[in-house]
Amino acid sequence: MQSSLKPAGSGHLQLLVCFLLLYSRPGSCSDINAHDGQGQVGSEQLWTFQGLIASVFQYLQLIFHQIVPEGMFWADDIAYELMTKKVEHLSRLHPQYPCRKDMKAVSPTANAGVRSKQEEKLQLLSPQKSPTVKVNRDRCFTTKVIPKATKQEATHPTKGFFGPFPTVGLNLVAD
């Protein structure tokens, strides 16, 4: 039996629910009712814990798929800044205009740089899926990421986010 998610006074939990609501449907953070965990817009839909966690992991996986092909590595506060910019960007999106002016979906993998190492890293994040990212038409968006790694670091990383993982080869995404 699945239980519904109810933010019992936790500001962090309400922020997470707000983030997911902004990403998944129109509205704002003020549409969230803190007493029952549902939004006033589309309140017939219940957020289950498993559904919420799956949405978070899918969204983070999409971010990883956009960052890895560019040779990005997270250090210090870069991850925090990226997520902050992402939340701000999502709150400004207009539901009728989720794509660029030419009305084509934004391709998160525009560069065809060094693929072998990058594909290997992507397979660590999602071993059962291809390294290309499919962008849903009603959820297309762009992210502006400031590169912190040089070409040499991108092809031969010595330190950074992608170090040796103790769970290499295992599927890290919750079902």
Swiss-Prot record:
> What is the role of this chain?
May play an important regulatory role in corticotrophs.
Gene Ontology CC: cytoplasmic vesicle; endoplasmic reticulum; Golgi apparatus
Q: Which domain of life is it from?
A: Eukaryota
Could you provide one GO biological process annotation from this protein's UniProt record?
in utero embryonic development
Expression triggers: Up-regulated by high levels of glucose.
Location (main, coarse): endoplasmic reticulum
Per the record, the similarity remark reads:
Belongs to the RESP18 family.
Q: Where in the cell is it found?
A: Endoplasmic reticulum; Golgi apparatus; Cytoplasmic vesicle, Secretory vesicle lumen
Record InterPro entries? RESP18, RESP18_dom
Q: What is this protein called?
A: Regulated endocrine-specific protein 18
- Keyword tags: Cytoplasmic vesicle, Endoplasmic reticulum, Golgi apparatus, Signal
Which Pfam families does this one have?
RESP18 (PF14948)
Tissues expressing this chain: Pituitary, hypothalamus and pancreas. Highest levels are found in somatotrophes, mammotrophes, and gonadotrophes, and lower levels are found in corticotrophs and thyrotropes.
Signal sequence annotation: 1-29
